[in-house]
């Protein structure tokens, strides 16, 4: 399994147990599902729960939400639904990413391509009809403010509305488990 951790906060943001695609070499889009499950239960895509599980008949607390958000304990950050706050955040976050890319020895050509592709991505997010539908989440750790936002958008996929979790590729560390 591959875990995607935030480059700056170290928080686990997603894993390869969810269908994903890379867009424009800058954004991973993970397809999640809206789920209802026992509080704290983690269900991996393709897992087969045991038929032998014993039910003691006790009342259980349930939770509902996006499986990716629940599995990785992401925290909703509604303040970023204010477009000005989001713009300020993305501007500062981009500066940090570019500085990190430079310190890691990335070529100027690579950095320029990244900036161009990110500009296109951010411009598409900021369209009023689209931006007002987005949800924002951060990692659960104490350094979450240092990291990136997981941006969620609901889209029609095969006749059902599914949550798409968007993460900036260059802001992730890939960890094999």
Swiss-Prot record:
Q: Per the database record, which ranges form the TCTP domain? A: 1-177
Query: Does Chaperone show up as a keyword for this record?
Result: no
What name does the UniProt record give this protein?
A: Translationally-controlled tumor protein homolog
The family note in this entry says: Belongs to the TCTP family.
Asked whether the keyword Transcription regulation is assigned, the reply is no
Q: Which UniProt keywords apply?
A: Calcium, Cytoplasm
SS bond partners = none
Q: Which PROSITE patterns has this protein been placed in?
A: TCTP_3 (PS51797)
Predominant location of this chain?
Answer: cytoplasm
InterPro entries, alphabetized = Mss4-like_sf, Mss4/transl-control_tumour, TCTP, Translational_control_tumour_p
Subcellular location as annotated: Cytoplasm
Origin species, per record, is: Trichinella pseudospiralis (Parasitic roundworm)
Q: Name one GO cellular component term.
A: cytoplasm
Alphabetically, the GO molecular function entries are: calcium ion binding
> What the protein does?
Involved in calcium binding and microtubule stabilization.
């Amino acid at each position: 399994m591959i875990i995607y951790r935030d480059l700056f906060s170290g928080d686990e943001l997603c894993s390869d147990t969810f269908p994903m695609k890379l867009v424009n070499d800058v954004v991973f889009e993970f397809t999640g599902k809206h789920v209802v499950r026992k509080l704290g239960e983690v269900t991996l895509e393709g897992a087969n729960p045991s038929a032998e599980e014993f039910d003691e008949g006790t009342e259980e607390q349930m939770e509902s939400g996006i499986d990716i958000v629940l599995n990785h304990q992401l925290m909703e950050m509604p303040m970023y639904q204010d477009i000005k706050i989001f713009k300020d955040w993305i501007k500062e976050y981009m500066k940090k990413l570019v500085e990190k890319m430079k310190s890691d020895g990335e070529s100027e050509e690579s950095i320029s391509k990244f900036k161009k592709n990110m500009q296109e991505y951010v411009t598409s997010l900021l369209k009023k009809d689209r931006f007002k539908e987005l949800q924002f989440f951060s990692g659960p750790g104490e350094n979450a403010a240092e990291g990136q936002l997981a941006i969620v958008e609901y889209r029609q996929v095969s006749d059902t509305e599914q949550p798409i979790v968007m993460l900036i590729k260059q802001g992730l560390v890939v960890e094999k488990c």
